[in-house]
A protein has these predicted regions:
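Catalytic phosphate/metal-binding cores of nucleic-acid and nucleotide-processing enzymes, i.e., regions
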Residues: 8-10, 41-43, 90-94
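Long, contiguous binding/interaction regions
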Residues: 2, 11, 57, 86-90
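Short, charged N-terminal beta->alpha structural module
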Residues: 1-24
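Short glycine-/small-residue-rich Rossmann-like dinucleotide-binding loops
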Residues: 52-53
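Ser/Thr/Gly-rich flexible loops in soluble cytosolic domains mediating phosphotransfer, phosphorylation
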Residues: 67-94
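A short, well-structured beta->alpha microelement
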Residues: 25-40
Length: 94
């Protein structure tokens, strides 16, 4: 399973990836808007939006690309490790 995490804190990117590995998920983390962002998303199983620390432009770009590719979008207001872990538990359970 693969996920794209959009938002969160720059300094926690590595920790987000480590938690995803714990649930056997490959992860890409985008904490800021990057050039050719839409191309870099790829085709993950889910896009997780950590909405409290992310620009509106990045959220809109991620949502638009996910809708275009029919990818599940999960919004989470918090960007803590425990909240990400809860989201991953729900994804793995389904």
């Amino acid at each position: 399973m693969s996920v794209v995490i959009v938002g969160g804190h720059d300094r926690m990117s590595k920790q987000y990836i480590d938690i995803c590995k714990k649930y056997n998920c490959k992860a890409k983390v985008f904490t800021q808007m990057e050039t050719r962002f839409r191309d870099k998303i790829g085709n993950p199983d889910a896009v997780i939006l950590l909405t409290n620390v992310v620009s509106h432009k990045l959220v809109l770009a991620a949502k638009k690309e996910a809708d275009k590719k029919q990818i599940t979008v999960i919004r989470n207001h918090k960007s803590t490790l425990s909240s990400l872990e809860n989201v991953l538990q729900q994804i793995v359970a389904n």
